[in-house]
């Protein structure tokens, strides 16, 4: 059983939808929960948790304001002594095709989704390092992983969060900090009007929330993109094909085009453990042999 009795969690965008569901489930498993959202929604969810016998407090700060975020984390540390779990869930939509989208709408979505997660993660990073324990979840999306019409701003932010997760998982490993992404599909205020009603009835937030528990548990993985919806769970991977090496100085672009099928062939596809794995693969195919160090 996943027991979070000793843990303190912050959930952003928790005034409704997925965030509310996450906060309630974390509290049911014993975590003390900071419910973050704008307006009075956070207070209502915190009261629900307390009335059900859990421990919660609300914070109405904007994740786009780094000063307010830092103050939220500091109040949490003062009251509860630690922060173990951060679920970066806050988000908005400003959907339009790229040609019709204003730069302001593009930037605003980046500010909320990406920079909001950066501000919150930055605020908890040092406390988690000091306590040698942390669980951080970024909310990515299939719109970022694969693209979606009318969501260039949203997709950009969501793919960037996957990149942020990849690096922070590497940097946090030696401090006991595990960082993952969840890519949810759920019926929320953000998806109303986008998906048909008969689909929304199957995509309840409660069917995504178990994925959050898996990603914040003691046994949580790290550097994983967990997809979740309608009670189904999958993992998305960013992979690298074996590809090919072209002789020539420089290689011929015509030969590259002619042999394109070999470049995209997914046999022996790999999941790189870190960014330099790509250059290591390419140098190896080019016949590079590292210079032996003196004395070895």
Regions found by a protein language model. Name each.
Residues 3-34:
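Canonical Rossmann dinucleotide-binding motif of NAD(H)/NADP(H)-dependent dehydrogenases/reductases
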Residues 5, 52-55, 75-88, 94, ...:
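A glycine-rich helix->loop->beta "capping" turn
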Residues 60-71, 103:
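The beta1-alpha1 cofactor-binding region of Rossmann-like NAD(H)/NADP(H)-dependent oxidoreductases
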Residues 97-98, 102-110:
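Substrate-binding pocket helix/loop in short-chain dehydrogenase/reductase
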Residues 121, 157:
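Active-site helix of classical SDR
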Residues 141:
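Residue(s) in the substrate-gating loop at a strand-loop-helix junction
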Residues 181, 199-292:
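C-terminal helical subdomain
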């Amino acid at each position: 059983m996943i027991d979070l009795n000793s843990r303190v969690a912050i959930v952003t965008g928790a005034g409704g939808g997925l965030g509310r569901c996450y906060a309630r489930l974390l509290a049911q498993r014993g975590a003390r929960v900071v419910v973050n959202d704008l307006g009075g929604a956070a207070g209502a969810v915190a009261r629900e948790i307390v009335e059900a016998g859990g421990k919660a407090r609300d914070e109405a700060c904007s994740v786009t304001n780094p000063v307010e975020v830092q103050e939220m984390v500091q109040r949490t540390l003062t009251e509860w002594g630690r922060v173990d779990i951060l679920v970066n869930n806050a988000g908005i939509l400003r959907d339009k095709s790229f040609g019709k989208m204003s730069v302001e709408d593009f930037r605003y979505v980046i500010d909320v989704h990406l920079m909001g997660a950066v501000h919150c993660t930055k605020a908890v990073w040092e406390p988690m390092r000091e306590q040698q324990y942390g669980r951080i979840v970024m909310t990515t999306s299939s719109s970022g992983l694969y693209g979606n019409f009318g969501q260039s701003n949203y997709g950009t932010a969501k793919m960037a969060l996957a990149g942020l997760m990849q690096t922070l998982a590497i940097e946090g490993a030696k401090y006991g900090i595990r960082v993952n992404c969840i890519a949810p599909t759920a019926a929320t205020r953000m998806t109303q009007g986008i998906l048909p009603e008969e689909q929304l009835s199957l995509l309840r937030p409660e069917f995504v929330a178990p994925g959050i528990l898996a990603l914040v548990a003691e046994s949580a993985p790290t550097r994983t993109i967990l997809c979740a919806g309608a009670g189904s769970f999958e993992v998305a991977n960013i992979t690298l094909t074996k590809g090919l090496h072209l002789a020539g100085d420089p290689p011929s672009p015509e030969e590259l085009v002619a042999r394109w099928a070999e470049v995209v062939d997914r046999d022996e596809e790999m999941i790189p453990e870190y960014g330099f794995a790509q250059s290591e693969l390419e140098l190896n195919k080019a016949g590079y042999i590292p210079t032996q160090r003196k004395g070895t």
